[in-house]
Amino acid sequence: MAFWGVEVKPGKTFTLKNNEATGIRRLHLSQATLGHGTATNRSILQCNVGNKSPLLLCVLTPDKVDSCQLNLEFEETDEVIFSVIGPRSVHLTGYFLGRSTGFRPNDDESESFGEDIVDTDMEKGSSDDYDYSDSFINDDDPAVRGSHVSSTDDDEISIKEMTAKTKEKKKNGKGRRLRKKFQVSDSDSDETSARADESSNEDSVEVLNNGNEPKIAKVHSSESPLPSRVTRSKARKSTLESGEPAKCEKTFEAKINTHKTLDNREDKPLDDAKLSPVQKDCEILSKKKRNKERSKSSAIIIDSDDGEGKNMPESLQNENPVSDKGIKSSSDVLLSQNGDATLSKKKKKRDRREETTDVPECPEKKKQAIDKNIEKEAGTKKPLETRTLSNGVIIEDIEKGKLDGKSAVKGKKVSILYTGKLKDTGNLFDSNLGEDPLRFRLGGENVIEGLSIGVEGMRVGDKRRLIIPPALGYSKRGLKEKVPKSAWLVYEVEAVKIR
């Protein structure tokens, strides 16, 4: 690799030419960086390859994107022209690569003994077109050839011994090792045989040819047994080399049968008769717990419905005796299991008390309670300041909020909590306590005029009592049947939010 860099200035182009002496050179373009300058406009880098239309590579903007990482390689027979569109130059950096080399599919795979393959002229092709005549050593050659050693038994030849033998072969120049990646062929012809991929999870067979005495190693399988077609092809291969098919078939079939028996044993579930006594006790206890939970839930439902049974329809009332019988039977079972009737009765009573105490109150009752508490507090609190306006509205300041908060002025949106009562009778006719605050624009027509006048000038957290005359209340229309037209109104108001 050789470093490469250039500055492409605006209005000028840079042409990348191939070197005629060394042939085509591969340029790896790594980064584009904005040059020095005071211009704030963006600069665009583009390139032309031969007569093709220009392509934009990156856009650089000062103070935002000053550099851009690129990962581009140029190996073109035509000229590559770089140019800049914009006020500032662009610096390009990268490096030259060597000549392009072909892809080697077996580069990532390592030889079984850490040695490279030499003197092997292999061509890509299908398993049917390839001639395997040169793939095996003749029987006359006393050299020992081995594939991957997958056996870990003590009787197997160790890796160290195999490496020593291969070194001796190289010194003498007699042995030559060859490795190929075979695939299992679908045809059952005698000319081609199945080849298994070389990996740690696949079955491997080691054949040692010493004269005419074949030795077949054990088959080691980590995940699954060999398919029948592979066994046939391998057995056929061994017959061609050694002439003893019986031994090969017996060894392969014995291994496959052992795998099948082991798989069948693992797949069979355990019967109930073979369970240990501890497991049986656990199952009985879990069933008892389920029965208890069911009986408790059904008892609670019936006890809560006892008070409302009178108002229920006849169809639902007729269903109660059936459920009672079912509960009695389940409770009898529980009594027979526990042996103590008094404890179960106490538990039922306790559950009934908890059910009665945990019944949630109605929202209307809660609201009434809140209103009563507010009325008591408002009645006990004395006004800090009282003033009467010229239009008859009486304003009593009960509590001061934030002194530095926003003041309610006409045109602003105000959110308030309020309670409205009649001055003469004290009856509550309107309230939003416990609900969302009332939101309106001050000076608008969404609320009565007296309420809008009384809220003006309040800050967040302020509380006021407003006494509004009928003329500024509901004198024109009234409020349904709750407020007569001639009624004086008393509002307790709290400012929650001012915008």
From Swiss-Prot:
MF (Gene Ontology): peptidyl-prolyl cis-trans isomerase activity
Cystine residue pairs: none
Keyword hit for Kinase: no
Extent of Basic and acidic residues compositional bias: 157-166, 244-253, 260-286, 352-365
Gene3D superfamilies, per the entry: 3.10.50.40, Nucleoplasmin core domain
Region (Disordered): 101-365
Enzymatic reactions: [protein]-peptidylproline (omega=180) = [protein]-peptidylproline (omega=0)
UniProt biased composition (Acidic residues): 108-120, 128-141
Basic residues bias (residue ranges): 167-182
Keyword annotations of the record: Isomerase, Rotamase
Pfam family, one: FKBP_C
Keyword Isomerase: yes
Location of the PPIase FKBP-type domain: 411-499
Ranges annotated as biased composition (Polar residues): 328-341
Stated family: Belongs to the FKBP-type PPIase family.
Function: PPIases accelerate the folding of proteins. It catalyzes the cis-trans isomerization of proline imidic peptide bonds in oligopeptides.
Stated name of the protein: Peptidyl-prolyl cis-trans isomerase FKBP43
Organism: Arabidopsis thaliana (Mouse-ear cress)
